[in-house]
Amino acid sequence: MKAKILLLVSIFFLSVTIPQAIAQGLTGRAYYKSSSQIKIAMDSTKMAPEQMAEIQAQLKKQMERDYILSFTQTESNWKQAESLGGGPATASSGGMTMVINTGSQDKILYKNLADQSFLREEEVMGKEFLIKDTLEPSEWELTSETKKIGNYTAQKATYSRIVDSQRFSTGMTEMENVKDTIRVTAWFTPEIPVSHGPDNFFGLPGLILEVQNQGRILICEKIELNPSTNPVKIEQPKKGKVVNREEFRAMQEAGMKQMMNQYQGKPGEGNQFTIRIGN
């Protein structure tokens, strides 16, 4: 009986320590593709439905992006991959030009899970900022649903929360304060035992391979684990004036108000406005 107990204890010890030992030395790169569904509601007297459909189709195509997540056990970098089409998504029809800024190629998001901190390079009205603050963990709910993503078995997790946000009124004449419910679905694989994920997402018991968030889909297409020819190096962003999360949100709000004023423009000139949706 004592021998059986010792054997069970030994098996349990190995089952716990071996994955931990593997994870402690684990590094890698995950390559993601981003796509977005664009839905923009405007006053029908300002733009015909055909014009809006044309703009939305142009933006959807241009907003496809490639990203790279580099990671160790506790740190990660998230940045856009180099490409010829890495600038803002731009569409125009009938004198209206719309620009959606999805983040510059050289902007970096750094996350440190050990001390629950992050650094993120951002830009508002041509000025560079470095957001430095604590990570906001999500209350993930794990499900039993699984599917294959590439060679990995992924498990489904979800969360939702209510946030305060601002958006343009239908006529694009003023800003409205609204309550939005954010619903996120993620698929993670315990086969890669790190709690990292694309963009702002993290905190699951395995690498997040896919995220569905408000019309945006991020999906992992390739993974390199412990690469020997090009070892993983985690870079901390340094460019820009250091601000916290709330200070940056206030600057974004001011930028949105300025954008609204620019949109109103002079009659007959045509209008251009920019929407920023994050990195």
Language model regions located:
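Extended soluble regions of mature proteins
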Residues: 25-279
